[in-house]
Amino acid sequence: MTHDIVVIGAGPAGLTAGIFAVRRSMDVVVLGDPTSMSTMEEATLVDDWPGMPGVAGPELFAKMTAHAKKLGVLVKQEKALEIRSKGKLFVVKTDKAEYEAKTVIIATGAKHRKAMVPGEEKFAGRGVSYCANCDGPIFKGRKVAVIGGGDTAATYALLMEQIGAETSLIHRRDELRAVDTYRKELKKSKVKLILNSVLKEIKGDKMVKSIVVQDVNTKKLTDIPMDGVFVAIGTVPASELGKNVGIKTDESGFIIVDRSQMTSVPGVFAAGDCSNNKTKRIVTSAAEGSIAAEMAYEHIREAEL
């Protein structure tokens, strides 16, 4: 069986692509990786989704998934392993099956950027986390550090304070990059800001016991007792799948797309956080997914596939 579209990724970009595909009466399957969560699922609070201010990320994800399935989008929990060309068509291999498609939409999102400091790998899952929404509750009444200065770091710090953790937010610059809304909330909170400081090491025995922080100006090192560390310093694109068919990426690894979300390979599109579009938001990922589906429809018609 040949599908019109195979969408790789079941986050906001992938699900929206699926929705717009079925509205065009196309045969589409959306493949969600069961081993990872989308950034939407991990989001503590989504303040910029129109009509639903303050919605929790998992709630928005559940509603979007339900919407897609209600319209008839086939969503499968399978990990995509490879894309390969087959004449004018494509084959997507997963850990369970192979899918032949006229077009492919890559919506694999991005992965958490690591701090790359001693102890990070050793204590992953033993005090080091990249998702406060997932692991936050176990740190109630304990000391935690959130590393980063953007929106994600700010929301993690606010969430950890709400949970009841003694929270420090550590950022390398003299002011946060987070939007004003979150900065104002942090000022009203009990979150301790440690600015002009970088994480140098995570220490412990079986679990995290402390972190070493360096002042960027004085170079002084300080050992601070901690039970948990949440790393929130951005993401790197999950764009490896496209390399097998020759898809071009930029210097940071993001998939290069044009205004139609088409990659350098005709018939393969990319949408969401894995693309090289500058704005990384849930709402823009959804928009890119809709464009990719519409343009895939046009590509199939024009190529007479």
Language model segments and positions:
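A Rossmann-like FAD-binding core segment of flavoenzymes
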Residues: 62, 68-94, 98-101, 162-259, ...
